[in-house]
Design a protein with these regions (language model features):
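Non-catalytic regulatory/interaction regions at protein termini and inter-domain linkers
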Residues: 1-220
């Protein structure tokens, strides 16, 4: 479903309280604090309904705990009873390199493995993350260059769609965008094409703009 086809728009903080189980939502944001508030609300609502929730980002765990506590999440309670899991992970940068020689690919794989092993292990290994009902992935993939964009899309196809999507987990995955409207309107630019492709891969989208303006709706 395209943006034009969607007839049901909601405020992001309301939308995340109504996400159906098993749906994957992409969150494009211009303002980090707004994106965090939306993500935390998604986690908070899950905990209220006794869901196991996991939050993955590059931020230090104690900082995330403090920020969650500030909006009223009982962090100590839910981490103690294993309903809330907070992980600090390394952002992925080069999941896929299509045109490199074999030796360079193997070298990159070896170097990459140490950096991303904690991320992929947490996502794939139930003993590490349990069977989380809700997961927030905050910027777990860098998209600063065209090669990283290509790599990210391969990760979206090969990992999230094939692994996480079929696990039944409900997910919010966030990406920073400097200017959402101008970027997605540029159909010829690499970032505009990338955003449009992601809209085809997710069940819903949240656009979180500056000054706490935003809109969210289902895509499927």
């Amino acid at each position: 479903m395209s943006i034009k086809d969607s007839s049901f728009f909601e405020q992001p903080l309301s939308f995340v309280n109504k996400v159906e189980e098993g749906k994957h939502i992409v969150l494009f944001y211009e303002e980090l604090e707004y994106a965090k508030m939306i993500s935390f609300q998604f986690i908070k609502d899950g905990l209220v309904h006794q869901k196991d929730c996991s939050y993955l980002s590059e931020e230090e765990v104690e900082l995330v705990k403090t920020e969650m506590s500030d909006i009223g999440i009982g962090v100590n309670k839910f981490t103690s009873n294993n309903h809330l899991h907070i992980y600090q992970v390394t952002s992925l940068t080069d999941y896929y390199h299509p045109r490199e020689g074999t030796e360079l690919i193997e070298d990159r794989k070896a170097k990459r493995k140490a950096a991303v092993d904690n991320t992929t292990t947490i996502l794939r290994n139930p003993s590490k993350i349990r069977k989380s009902d809700r997961i927030v992935l905050r910027c777990v993939y860098n998209v600063d260059t065209e090669e990283q964009i290509k790599s990210n899309l391969r990760w979206e196809y090969d990992f999230r769609c094939k692994n996480l999507k079929h696990s039944g987990t409900t997910l919010v995955s966030s990406y920073p965008i400097n200017d959402i409207i101008s970027t997605i309107s540029d159909s010829t630019g690499s970032y505009g094409k990338w955003m449009s492709t992601l809209l085809e891969l997710y069940d819903g989208v949240i656009f979180a703009r500056k000054f706490w303006k935003g809109v969210a709706f289902n895509l499927a």
